[in-house]
Structures are given as C-alpha cells and as structure tokens.
C-alpha cells in the first residue's frame, strides 16, 4: 500500500504533460497490444521461434531461465494476452519450489505490486487440493503504471470530475485540509483502477500427475467487456 501511495503521489506531481502512447502491460518490454503479426515479429526479434502443431500456433523459446511456449490471444484482432507455459512438467515438490521462486521474484521486483501473500508452505498438499477440491494455485501481481506513458491529463481530468460532484471549483482551487485529503484519496482510487488494467499472474497446472506453470500477461483494455453482445 505504501508503494501504491508513493506511485499515486508521483502521478499527481507529474500530471503536466500529454501521453505519447497508451500505458499497457508489457512482456519483455513489448506492449501487449497490436496485431498478432506485429506481436509475432517482436517476439521473434527476442529469439522466440514460431511453431505449429496441427492448428495450434505458438512460439518456442527461453524465458526467465526456463524453456517455454508462448501463445498470443486476441479480441477483435487486438492482442490482449500473452500466455507463457513451461515446456516441461515437474513433480509436486519441484512445482512448489518453482511457484515460490516466482512469487519471490515478483515480490522483489519494484515494477510489480502484489495483491496478497502467495508463498506455499511445506504443509500444502497440492495434489490432494487440486484433485479433491479443485483448488487453484494462483498468484496475482500488477505492473506499476508508467507515468511517462500514462494519459496524465486524462487522469487529472478524471480526478477533477469526480471531485466536482462533491466540491465547487473554488473549493478545489484553494482546498482545505479535508479536501486535500479527499483529493489524495480520489487519486489513489483512480491510480489503483489504472494499475488493475495491467495484471500479470501465474498458476499451477496439473496434467496426468505432473505439473507446470502458466503465466499470463494481460492487457485489460483490449479484453472483451461485453461490447459485442
């Protein structure tokens, strides 16, 4: 929460310039956006090799020290997800170590904010819980908003419009201590909404008694929100 507050206060301080591009989730520095073709080209430039098995298309390569398959998902011809799946399966003990290592890496990366604590303990019986209770083992993180790319003027306007439902222009121009606190709280709320558009999460997948990790880099701006209904 302290990190989020710092980010939002920095956002308030830097609300002075136009955005050059949309701030979306990135994978290896590549925005999760655009067309499948452009995304493939960018991934190939990172060393990934296109593969096709039947009708299933993906790219193969190395990511974070593991051999992986990368899948591109779209909505209305716009990329909204990069899915990264381990190429090799491991046993229960090894997957717990891998899961916890990933949690630690994300927790110690200043570019991410966790929603909760996700570390598995020695007592966690993954096989039993997944088989009997259909439990999901997932960890959710969010990429910190890039204020050089964020639409700062748009954010300022959003904060202002929300506050105008409670206060007058004059009160916002010369805010009291109470209104100043309300301005910060509103900015934190809107900053959190911005952050939630950039989720990166992973889960344990079980297949035939073996396990692997699937990671998801999602661009919530491009996901389906029922507009085609």
Q: How does the language model describe each region?
A:
Residues 20-50, 88-229:
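Non-cytosolic coordination micro-motifs
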Residues 18-20, 81-82:
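A short alpha-helix capping/helix-coil boundary motif
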Residues 57, 79-80, 211-212:
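Hydrophobic residues embedded in beta-strands of well-ordered beta-sheets
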